[in-house]
């Protein structure tokens, strides 16, 4: 083995005795001559300097080796003041820079008194080794005390053989070289939040280092980073996921307990858009705390068509069969001094709004009859008491006109013959329920000019051989309101003068048999072959129904157990008729009935509400 090959295998940093020249034959040595140097002095420093220089021994690294292995050294806890940042540059035995106190000025030349070996710089004395103490204090307290200076002047532990200068805690023995300066302090702090101080003890420098020469110790810490990196990454992921875990628990407790803030919005959102919500009911009900005056008033305030009450809040029938005026008819009336708007919401909240979802698209009767326009209609037993209705004028007894009509006529008979052998049946479409009320009251009817001719011809054709039944329905109401029998031919020269519109001419007598509200859903399955096979509910005025289909319709109407009828609103329509008559008296005195804008809008509103939507 040549000397040049031996020089290449020497540890890094050892000086070559033959510099700047070729190796001659006389300089060649045997292998066994280097054994004492390679085996006996592995720990000595290789930086030899001339002893004649009084400054060099103390200024640079000491020329003597350490007398103990570095794996016995305690990791500095930073108990000493962070002095190394005031030191000047020097070099350790492995060739890396470090900071040491300047021994040139104000320091003794003896190496025994040099801070390099006095525990101030390295704390190399094995006495007081306490690894668990490092885990408790370094990760939580000491890293914050010395990180102000030590993190800026510390170097990788691989360059110091696993030792730390002046208790600088930011670097561990397994610190990767590519990690930013000071990141170890952050890792230790975050890891301490997760696994505590007891699990940090295995990361102490001395635990994973072999007890060998300095050159071997310096390479040992380079292996653990590969295995320790996943553990740190896992701790970061666990810590990041911790804040998200309590969130579902808080929501669950809030929904079950009902005492936190989330339940009120949930309860509020459940009420919004549902028909059981009574929060919006008092708004239209407040102005109805008054009775209708009987003196003359503008028609636009008092007598709109029944369709004008679609937006109003219907009321349930009272126990005595009478109903209070609907809200849609009394919105413009002033509130009397004795009215109590606050008493209305409890009464309105008791009504079951069964069919309200479909009301905005069709005509709605003015009272609580709207609750019965469905297959699952509520019974009259659901009507609220009238004790809390405030200033509403409620008749104590049924209307006298209605009582007289019921005594004279046997409405809704149980022994009705719905299967006549001969007869004819026609559909009657009314523009308003006001006209239905007056037809029941006066037992008369009048259709259009074309309708009168058709009905008159049909009546005469029967020649009393069979009945002629009329199935009444208000345009857009969604139900049939009754059945009447035509009892006389049409008198074209007579004008009744009782209809809500004065454009009707002619009159014929009728007798009302059934007065009940039957929903279209009960009759929609019956189709008419003489009307393009359309349902009987989709018919025009004076549309004739074939006798076989008419028997089905009459049977359903006769057997249907109704819950509402126009009788529930009879008092209401009586008041409307009185108001219209008072308006007509003013017109007779010489004023143009259409000169007043309010009167004109009133009649237009009636026409609009009477049309089929």
Curated annotation (Swiss-Prot):
GO cellular component: cytoplasm; cytoplasmic stress granule; cytosol; nucleus; P-body
Biased composition (Basic and acidic residues): 578-587, 604-613
Record region (Localization to mRNA processing bodies (P-bodies)): 2-397
Region feature Interaction with m6A-containing mRNAs, mapped onto this chain: 398-613
A GO biological-process term: regulation of cell adhesion
Stretch list, region Disordered: 1-43, 215-234, 244-396, 578-613
Compositional bias annotation for Low complexity: 218-234, 295-307, 345-360
One Pfam family here: YTH
Family to which the UniProt record says this protein belongs: Belongs to the YTHDF family. YTHDF2 subfamily.
Name used for this protein in its record: YTH domain-containing family protein 2
Species for this entry: Danio rerio (Zebrafish)
Organism taxonomic ancestry: Eukaryota, Metazoa, Chordata, Craniata, Vertebrata
């Amino acid at each position: 083995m040549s000397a040049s090959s031996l020089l290449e295998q020497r540890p890094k940093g050892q000086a070559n005795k033959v510099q700047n020249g070729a190796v001659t034959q006389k300089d060649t040595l045997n292998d066994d001559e280097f054994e004492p140097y390679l085996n006996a002095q592995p720990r000595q420093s290789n930086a030899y300097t001339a002893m004649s220089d009084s400054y060099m021994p103390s200024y640079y690294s000491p020329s003597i080796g350490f007398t103990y292995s570095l794996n016995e050294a305690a990791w500095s806890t930073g108990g000493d003041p962070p002095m190394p940042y005031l030191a000047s540059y020097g070099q350790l035995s492995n060739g890396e820079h470090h900071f040491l106190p300047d021994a040139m000025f104000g320091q003794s030349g003896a190496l025994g008194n040099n801070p390099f070996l006095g525990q101030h710089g390295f704390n190399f004395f094995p006495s007081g080794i306490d690894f668990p103490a490092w885990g408790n204090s370094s990760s939580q307290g000491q890293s914050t005390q010395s990180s102000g200076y030590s993190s800026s002047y510390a170097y990788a532990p691989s360059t110091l053989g696993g030792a730390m200068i002046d208790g600088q805690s930011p670097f561990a023995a397994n610190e990767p070289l590519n990690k930013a300066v000071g990141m170890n302090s952050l890792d230790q702090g975050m890891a301490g939040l997760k696994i505590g101080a007891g699990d940090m003890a295995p990361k102490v420098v001395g635990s994973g280092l072999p007890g060998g020469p300095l050159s071997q110790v310096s390479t040992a810490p380079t292996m653990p980073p590969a295995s320790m990196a996943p553990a740190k990454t896992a701790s970061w992921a666990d810590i990041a996921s911790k804040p998200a875990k309590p969130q579902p628990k808080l929501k669950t407790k809030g929904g079950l307990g009902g005492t936190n803030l989330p339940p009120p919005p949930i309860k509020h959102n459940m009420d919004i858009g549902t028909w059981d919500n009574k929060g919006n009911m008092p708004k239209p009900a407040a102005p109805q705390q008054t009775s209708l005056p009987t003196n003359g008033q503008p028609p636009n305030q008092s007598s709109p068509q029944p369709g004008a009450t679609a937006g109003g809040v219907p009321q349930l029938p009272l126990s005595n069969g009478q109903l209070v005026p609907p809200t849609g008819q009394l919105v413009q009336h002033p509130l009397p001094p004795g009215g109590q708007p606050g008493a209305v919401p409890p009464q309105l909240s008791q009504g079951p709004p069964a069919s309200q979802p479909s009301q905005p698209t069709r005509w709605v009767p003015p009272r609580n009859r709207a609750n019965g326009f469905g297959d699952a209609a509520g019974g009259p037993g659901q009507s609220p008491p009238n004790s809390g209705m405030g200033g509403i004028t409620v008749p104590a007894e049924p209307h006298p006109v209605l009582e007289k009509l019921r005594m004279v006529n046997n409405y809704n008979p149980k022994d009705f013959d719905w299967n006549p052998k001969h007869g004819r049946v026609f559909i009657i479409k009314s523009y308003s329920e006001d006209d239905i009320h007056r037809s029941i009251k006066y037992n008369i009817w009048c259709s259009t000019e074309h309708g009168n001719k058709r009905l008159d011809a049909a009546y005469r054709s029967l020649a009393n051989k069979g009945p002629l039944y009329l199935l009444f329905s208000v345009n857009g109401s969604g139900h049939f309101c009754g059945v009447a029998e035509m009892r006389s031919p049409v008198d074209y020269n007579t004008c009744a003068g009782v209809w809500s519109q004065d454009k009707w001419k002619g009159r014929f007598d009728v007798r009302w048999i059934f007065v009940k509200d039957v929903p279209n859903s009960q009759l929609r399955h019956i189709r008419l072959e003489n009307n393009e096979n359309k349902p009987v509910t989709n018919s025009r005025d004076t549309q004739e129904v074939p006798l076989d289909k008419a028997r089905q319709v009459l049977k359903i109407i006769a057997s249907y157990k109704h819950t509402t009828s126009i009788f529930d609103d009879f008092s209401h329509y009586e008041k409307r008729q009185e108001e219209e008559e008072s308006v007509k008296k003013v017109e007779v005195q010489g004023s143009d009935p259409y000169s007043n804008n309010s009167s004109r809008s009133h009649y237009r509103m009636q026409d609009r509400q009477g049309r089929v939507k």
